[in-house]
């Protein structure tokens, strides 16, 4: 079982504010789709609510919540272990948020798909500190500069351990 975390993070690890992503980067949305399509995705309840309770198409959507989630295209799990038991064993599992789930799953992850956004605004939700682990090695990195569609500089990075 390969567990990966995918997130867009600001310079100070902000990932959200008021249950929304504080920036809009169409290229990052394409990157997210490319790296999660046809895979199992795990998310927490607040992330589920942030996507308006709509499962992401062409993915197995697994939501971790103490409150039961009833939706025909979603698997509800009340713990991380139950969520992992719901996954397809031979596929890469993509953890898509939020902060609590990232923090709990970081220990088990072997890959991080990060979009570093040159953003210094406020937030109330953060990605966990991952740089303290010296075992993470960058295996892919691509810089993008802001343009008419993407108002911030950003960089795609994949780390592995």
Curated annotation (Swiss-Prot):
EC number(s) recorded for this UniProt protein: 1.5.1.3
GO cellular component terms given for this protein: cytosol
GO BP annotations, alphabetical order: dihydrofolate metabolic process; folic acid metabolic process; one-carbon metabolic process; tetrahydrofolate biosynthetic process
Disulfide cysteine pairs (residue numbers): none
UniProt pathway annotation: Cofactor biosynthesis; tetrahydrofolate biosynthesis; 5,6,7,8-tetrahydrofolate from 7,8-dihydrofolate: step 1/1
Keyword Transmembrane helix part of the UniProt annotation: no
EC main group: oxidoreductase
Gene3D superfamilies documented for this protein: Dihydrofolate Reductase, subunit A
Keywords recorded for this protein, A-Z: NADP, One-carbon metabolism, Oxidoreductase
Domain DHFR: 2-161
Binding site for substrate: 6-8, 28, 59, 115
Binding site residues for NADP(+): 7-8, 15-20, 44-47, 64-66, 96-101
InterPro entries, per database record: DHFR, DHFR-like_dom_sf, DHFR_CS, DHFR_dom
One Pfam family linked to the record: DHFR_1
GO molecular function, a single term: dihydrofolate reductase activity
Source taxon at top rank: Bacteria
Catalytic reaction(s) noted: (6S)-5,6,7,8-tetrahydrofolate + NADP(+) = 7,8-dihydrofolate + NADPH + H(+)
NCBIfam families in UniProt: PRK10769.1 (NF008037)
Function comment: Key enzyme in folate metabolism. Catalyzes an essential reaction for de novo glycine and purine synthesis, and for DNA precursor synthesis.
Family to which the UniProt record says this protein belongs: Belongs to the dihydrofolate reductase family.
Listed name of the protein: Dihydrofolate reductase
Species assigned in the record: Buchnera aphidicola subsp. Schizaphis graminum (strain Sg)
Taxon lineage: Bacteria, Pseudomonadati, Pseudomonadota, Gammaproteobacteria, Enterobacterales
